[in-house]
Amino acid sequence: MIQYVTAGESHGPALSAIVDGMPAGVPLTDEAINHQLARRQQGYGRGGRMKIETDKAEVLSGIRFGKTIGSPIAMVIRNRDWQNWTTTMAQFEQPQEAIPAITVPRPGHADLAGCIKYGFEDIRPVIERSSARETAARVAAGACAKLFLKALGIEIGSIVTAIGSAKEEMPQQELAAMLAHGAEAVATQADQSPVRMLSKSAETAAIAAIDEAKANGDTVGGIVDVFITGVPLGFGSYVQHNRRLDADLAAALLSIQAIKGVEIGTAFDNACKYGSQVHDEFIFSESGELTRPTNRAGGIEGSMSSGQVIHLRAAMKPISSLISPLQSFDIASMEPIPSRFERSDTCAVPAAGVVAEAVVAPVIANALLAKLGGDHFSEIHERLEAYRAYLANRLQRKS
């Protein structure tokens, strides 16, 4: 089972990630991992931090000659901004001068609950670890799982479908045609847009929404769609709650900072219709191949993959740090006071899509390993090809 942990503070020396459980023999390159980190840093509406950092993963263990060796993969991403925080974020040395404590929590952030939970008089430690800067380490970890899956013919990609009131307008038929070439083809096209949207009209409206929010000292959220192609039928299980693929994917997406809602397929629209209008029928083609003309279930039925494209949506709330502050209070004096501003983005929805790709990758990889087993890439690949051949034969109508 692939598991990972991250460590590090937003303005500490570095972020780190350890990925455990990766099979041996998986081809990985530092260029591919760093490409994912670069994708995370893109996007219109980002703040000053992205002008400072150029994220690169330094691999410390678990890879030899471009292939995994079955031991934990350890990676470090240096924080270039650390040089400006060596006193404020010193690990051991006591500052010669008192550093003012941060005592005003931001509405919508982890500040208040984290400060009370862990007994801090200063909110700074909460800010440092709850920051979305941590997602850089998760993107590096998820990149390893993404590359493992890609080598097996499974691709993960994302697009932005809404920023504020700006909505993606690309016809579903056109999107489906792109997905026929794999999820990465869609993501690659989205990456050409500063807001990772596919249509020019939606891009223009999204940029205008971000500009308006910035001019007003505000922030704006949005929606990202994640697609996973190449997943065969039968990953996941209905047998126990903790083996349900949809539950694991939703949990992974909700673990991302500021993601507050998840949809699988057209779930919320489905909820307002009759069953006869919702469920995806089984239709045999003239050649006897089993087909599904629709995919309203989003590629998951009974908590298992259906063999169709897995389609997930994640709703990202507007970022909590506002230049125009909301009302708050001082936890030291308990007096009302406007909230404070911590350097932040106006919009990070484009980056959220890249993070979403990263966090769902280990979920799919683990579902694959649970189904097929294997400690080395070659045996896993062989078993997957045999399973795909079995499915093709099993689901073919005999004449």
Curated annotation (Swiss-Prot):
NCBIfam families (alphabetical): aroC, PRK05382.1
InterPro entries documented for this protein: Chorismate_synth, Chorismate_synth_AroC_sf, Chorismate_synthase_CS
Residues binding FMN, per UniProt: R129, S130, S131, Q257, A258, G302, K317, P318, I319, S320, S321, R343
Chain coiled-coil ranges: none
EC number: 4.2.3.5
HAMAP family from the UniProt entry: Chorismate_synth
CC cofactor: FMNH2
Quaternary structure, from the entry: Homotetramer.
Pfam families found in the cross-reference section: Chorismate_synt
Annotated organism of origin: Chlorobium chlorochromatii (strain CaD3)
Binding locations of NADP(+): R40, R46
Reaction catalyzed: 5-O-(1-carboxyvinyl)-3-phosphoshikimate = chorismate + phosphate
Note on how the cofactor is bound: Reduced FMN (FMNH(2)).
PANTHER family assigned to the protein according to its UniProt record, in alphabetical order: CHORISMATE SYNTHASE (PTHR21085:SF0)
Protein name: Chorismate synthase
Pathways per UniProt: Metabolic intermediate biosynthesis; chorismate biosynthesis; chorismate from D-erythrose 4-phosphate and phosphoenolpyruvate: step 7/7
Family classification: Belongs to the chorismate synthase family.
GO cellular component: cytosol
GO annotation, biological process: amino acid biosynthetic process; aromatic amino acid family biosynthetic process; chorismate biosynthetic process
Enzyme class: lyase
